[in-house]
């Protein structure tokens, strides 16, 4: 028997992510309390709750750290929500945004920023913002046409923008020009905060920490820690001030691990998401699907080449000002510095100026230096630049780390993943689309080392596709010939842009049924992110019109065939959907459920995945009033697993169970066993389970999905005859 898991604070059993909006605030969440309790979750996980831009649909554009957002119900509404949830045995997790605030329109909507624009470095809020005061003024990139700003008393107006007048401490520049401040990625409307300053930390966290102390908030999710000057120090200060369960939105690549000295409980789960997805992808599909992709798009076979080109483009397009500022600190050859940034294989390394460089961080940057050196002329000062960003002046060390993340995010997440997509279910945040399939043994080894406090997830507000869209796409790895024939048929009828068409067909099928409005919005965003034909900075009305025509024709002329293909793979997609959901919910860690995904959800990237959720339908299904069989099955798996987790010691060890090539199976201590079908097409083609069996741990077991009871060695054909998954509880 394992020792019971203990922590000095309450660790959620599971969480349910809610996207708060002006239309869905605290009162609406409170009304869900009975449903969520019956579903089995332990905590409601709220999107940002501080005052944000009016009508903001996401809340990451904070305008005032001293107030709870009025549109949601304000502080009293939040307290009432917390009380209602508590009555149902539920807690509250809050999403906090320490890295940035918004530059609103009009700019007077951010009082702290207005003070700085008015009084410059003499403002008491000047230390809040990461501003480059070179020349005594901060660049504000808002000018988009020949209209002249107009002075109106103490205000300078430019269209909807407002600035203090006179313009003593700022200059208005072209909107495409880099701003005079650190920003979130390339988003000039989000200005970086300096929470490394203790006074700034205290001022920007006072309300949130007060809610923690009051017992209204029970845990925290930290947005974008990689933007901070010193994430380790920030998390130490946060833990000292709050001492509650805390997870961080840290994107890990490949075998990268969360720094051991970070005082937090884990990540928000993208690392687990990508490993689970690969479990349900057949590596044998790699070669034919890559060839199919190359044939349709003309893109390279090699993903790494696309990544390098994409990162170079975003550095040149978006980050000239940031690189110039960094180069001023680092010195030496600018091109060497750029190549080092492009070569970084992860979002950033972690070095604290004045402290010894951690071995893992040194290895990351030095390895990137070797890659950069191979691309630069002989004699380029790579070693000197590497040494400066690891051991040089404090600003050089910190600025380098803070720009690595934006280059990776914009170059890979928001460019390369929209250019290289042989199998789009692999194109996720932190994913590696050239890494087809996952080895069961490797997954078991990873799962055995998972922390009981880290978050796991399958869908978030930032995923490129919902879990059920990915479940459908994963089937294509087992049906490359059938998929090639279908795409060939559709493309012969309707085509538009070779760089986009193949992505369009994947997403049209996987998100089916989808109307022309949603489908156009997705492809329009995808085309702008890819930047091969249009971009956010370079729109093209003619291209947009052509895309609208493509969308209409694709649905009108090919919709019936697309629907037929989706229906044909439904048994396999359903198996993938239920399998990945069961695995995620029963792994070590704190499983998060993105709102609405307790049943099927075929959403694409935001804002599509932030649409309102039909909770009356979900209540009806949970009450057993019938519905779509896939929905019923997914809800049953979700509800049974979440409620079993409430009865399970979170420290129950992960024990791999042998189940052959077409199943993933594991026990959680002596109380639970999960079995999920994988690669279902191959299983069907070989004639089913045959004589394969699974040996259950000692004792009597009951399948929570069917009520059947088992002991000892069980034929998989018997165990999985009703559902493609089984969830057993020890009796």
Question: What are these model-derived regions, one by one?
Answer:
Residues 338, 342-346, 507-508:
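C-terminal reverse transcriptase regions that engage the nucleic-acid substrate
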Residues 1-54, 62, 66-71, 79, ...:
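Carbohydrate-interacting/catalytic domains
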Residues 100, 228-229:
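Catalytic P-loop NTPase motifs of RecA-like helicase/translocase cores
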Residues 81-126:
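Hydrophobic or amphipathic alpha-helical targeting/insertion segments
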